[in-house]
């Protein structure tokens, strides 16, 4: 019943966008983009509060949006953690334990519209810009990004090459924004006029076309050591996204897991990440 209601709601959005496009394609693109970039969850829940409250850092203003940071001080190199869509810094708790055992200095933050951070929406470009400013502030040696966090990390490194960063880890990261948009179109069932209007909206506001956001494209110019981890049965982001990324990332290694899902927070994964950063 719940799936049926969700499907019905999704189709109603598509019908709404299609009807809007009959009168204004520009408005249809704007509304489709707003829906695509509005998270339904990812805020701090009571189960998250006790853990995160202890490690609250300062709130950083990025593009007029306050971003909540968290800090786990250590004597070693600094690691920046970037969570995925509809998540928050709590998702890193198991990895943080392993990083602390090796004395890494750990920084995380909640993306716009997520966790304790301000805002209501998030897209790859604004997330990458958030990463850039956090990198300038904390000067991490290593960055770990899960899902959308991995995509934003690579986008930022491509757009703003930073030689102080030595290693990058991506977990279940998507390859192409165009593929995410195609999935969105298939789910909601809006027509190609709306899709074209959405692409125009992205270009007008962020100076990018949808097809420009591509991790295989970004990887060609990234010199940092990379560790790419992806589960072959991932139902959120297909494994071949990381295969294509690895193919174009000269200095990367690809770990294929089986049956660990999209979240990839199991101990065996965390140990492989920590070993990679420590080597």
Regions found by a protein language model. Name each.
Residues 260-269:
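Catalytic histidine-centered segment of alpha/beta-hydrolase-like enzymes
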Residues 89, 96-118:
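Conserved alpha/beta-hydrolase
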Residues 221-223, 228-230, 234:
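Short beta-strand/loop motif that positions the catalytic acidic residue
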Residues 2-59:
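An N-terminal hydrophobic leader/cap segment in hydrolases
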Residues 121-141:
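Alpha/beta-hydrolase active-site loop
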Residues 235-241:
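Conserved alpha/beta-hydrolase "acid-adjacent" motif
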Residues 145-153:
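Gly/Ala-rich beta-loop-alpha elbow adjacent to hydrolase catalytic centers
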């Amino acid at each position: 019943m719940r799936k049926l209601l969700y499907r019905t709601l999704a189709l109603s959005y598509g019908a709404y966008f299609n009807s809007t496009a009959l009168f204004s394609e520009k408005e249809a693109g704007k509304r489709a983009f707003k829906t695509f970039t509005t998270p339904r969850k990812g805020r701090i829940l009571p189960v998250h509060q006790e853990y995160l409250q202890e490690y609250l850092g300062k709130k950083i203003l990025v593009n007029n949006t306050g971003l909540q940071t968290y800090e786990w001080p250590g004597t070693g190199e600094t690691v920046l953690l970037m969570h995925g869509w509809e998540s928050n810094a709590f998702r890193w708790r198991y990895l943080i334990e392993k990083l602390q055992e090796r004395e890494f200095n750990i920084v995380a933050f909640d993306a716009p519209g997520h966790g304790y951070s301000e805002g209501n929406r998030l897209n790859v470009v604004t997330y990458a810009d958030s990463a850039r400013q956090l990198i300038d502030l904390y000067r991490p040696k290593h960055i770990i990004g899960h899902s959308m966090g991995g995509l934003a990390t690579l986008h930022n490194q491509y757009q703003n090459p930073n030689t102080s960063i030595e290693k990058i880890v991506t977990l279940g990261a998507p390859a192409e924004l165009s593929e995410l948009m195609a999935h969105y179109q298939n789910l909601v069932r809006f027509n190609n006029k709306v899709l074209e209007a959405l692409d125009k909206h992205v270009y007008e506001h962020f100076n990018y076309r949808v097809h420009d956001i591509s991790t295989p494209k970004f990887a060609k110019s990234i010199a940092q050591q990379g560790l790419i981890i992806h589960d072959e049965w991932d139902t959120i982001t297909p494994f071949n996204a990381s295969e294509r990324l690895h193919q174009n990332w000269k200095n990367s290694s690809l770990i294929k897991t089986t049956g660990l899902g999209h979240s990839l927070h199991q101990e065996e994964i965390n140990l492989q990440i920590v070993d990679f950063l420590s080597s």
